[in-house]
Curated annotation (Swiss-Prot):
Name this polypeptide is given: Mitomycin biosynthesis 6-O-methyltransferase
Organism: Streptomyces lavendulae
Active-site residues, record numbering mapped to chain: H259 (proton acceptor)
The protein's enzyme class: transferase
Gene this chain is encoded by: mmcR
Xref: Gene3D superfamilies: Vaccinia Virus protein VP39, Winged helix-like DNA-binding domain superfamily/Winged helix DNA-binding domain
Regulation acting on activity, per entry: Completely inhibited by Zn(2+) and Cu(2+).
């Protein structure tokens, strides 16, 4: 008698393959944590000048020798570091080199951001987010993500570096993709450390800017713009975009900010911007937009936003609905680089 094969009752080989795949997915958290520990200990930097023994690495990092050896042996099996197989030596390879400290590398900065204990605690409470639709960060850490990054300089630095590395790449893409030549003034709302504003001002010498950001980060933006020789063309405005937005600019920019907030807060922000806009002002929303077949990486970021801050990535239709509630409308949407980021040009309705 032949047993019918179904998704619940596959053949033996198919079942074994399915179990192996699921097991590999389940072990993903362990692999990530192992990488984080190697990064925290500074192993990639120590291997930059050549292979070293586990004994030497343990001495340099203050780690337990045998346990560090076990950690590196595991990571070598997934392609991070090379186990040379003789003399207890481990070496750098293409994957581990990506983890070297580099403010321009989204992977290197994100590896350090993800390693933070408060980040891991938030993911432990994912069930809370799925049940309630709210951020789990607050429940896991006893404070909000925004409060933590405001009060804790180390947390703020980890976050700003992670965001800054992404912005370094995207800033030039925005300046290349959108023509600001018809504008005299631009306001960057939640402009971070200033890389976007710097790129736009560099590309369009006739433009003057204002950057609105929370006080601790606003000073970092001032330093960057001063270092780029742009301080005389950009006012730094420390403040809260829920409270105040400068009136009457030709162009307003807001990049990777709206996805940090739930729908009600997005409408609050957009209404505040709409009030500040002139009848002929343009608002550029630069953000990930989910299309019909989004990449897994986009959907992971979507879930990360939920866990950390209760935010979300949105589709064009979802975003358009929020704009309508805010008295705004989409004029057009432009690609920005090869990924899911779009520049959405918006006018008052």
């Amino acid at each position: 008698m032949t047993v019918e094969q179904t998704p619940e009752n596959p053949g033996t080989a198919a079942r074994a393959a399915a179990e192996e795949t699921v097991n590999d997915i389940l072990q993903g958290a362990w692999k990530a944590r192992a990488i984080h520990v190697a990064v925290e200990l500074g192993v990639p930097e120590l291997l930059q000048e050549g292979p070293r023994t586990a004994t030497a690495l343990a001495e340099a990092t203050g780690a337990h020798e045998q346990t560090l050896r076990r950690l590196l042996r595991l990571l070598a099996t997934v392609g991070v570091f090379d186990d040379l197989g003789h003399d207890d030596l481990f070496a750098q390879n293409a994957l581990s080199a990506v983890l070297l400290p580099d403010p321009a590398s989204p992977v290197a900065t994100d590896a350090r951001f993800q390693a933070a204990p408060w980040h891991w605690r938030a993911w432990e409470q994912l069930t809370h987010s799925v049940r309630t639709g709210e951020a789990s960060f607050d429940v896991a850490n006893g404070t909000s993500f925004w409060q933590l990054t405001h009060e804790d300089p180390k947390a703020r630095e980890l976050f700003n570096r992670a965001m800054g590395s992404v912005s370094l790449t995207e800033a030039g893409q925005v300046a290349a993709a959108y023509d600001f030549s018809g504008a005299a003034t631009a306001v960057d709302i939640g402009g971070g450390r200033g890389s976007l504003m710097a790129a736009v001002l560099d590309a369009f010498p006739g433009l003057r800017g204002t950057l609105l950001e929370r006080p601790p980060v606003a000073e970092e933006a001032r330093e960057l713009l001063t270092g780029r020789g742009l301080a005389d063309r950009c006012e730094i405005l420390p403040g809260d975009f829920f409270e105040t937005i400068p009136d009457g600019a030709d162009v307003y920019l807001i990049k990777h900010v709206l996805h940090d907030w739930d729908d009600d807060d997005v409408v609050r922000i957009l209404r505040r911007i709409a009030t500040a806009m002139k009848p002929d002002s343009r608002l550029l929303v630069i953000d990930n937009l989910i299309d019909e077949r989004p990449a897994a990486s986009t959907l992971f970021v979507d879930l990360l936003l939920l866990v950390l801050v209760g935010g979300a990535e949105r589709s064009e239709s979802e975003f358009a609905a929020l704009l309508e509630k805010s008295g705004l409308r989409v004029e057009r949407s432009l690609p920005c680089g090869a990924g899911p980021v779009r520049i959405v040009e918006i006018r008052r309705a």
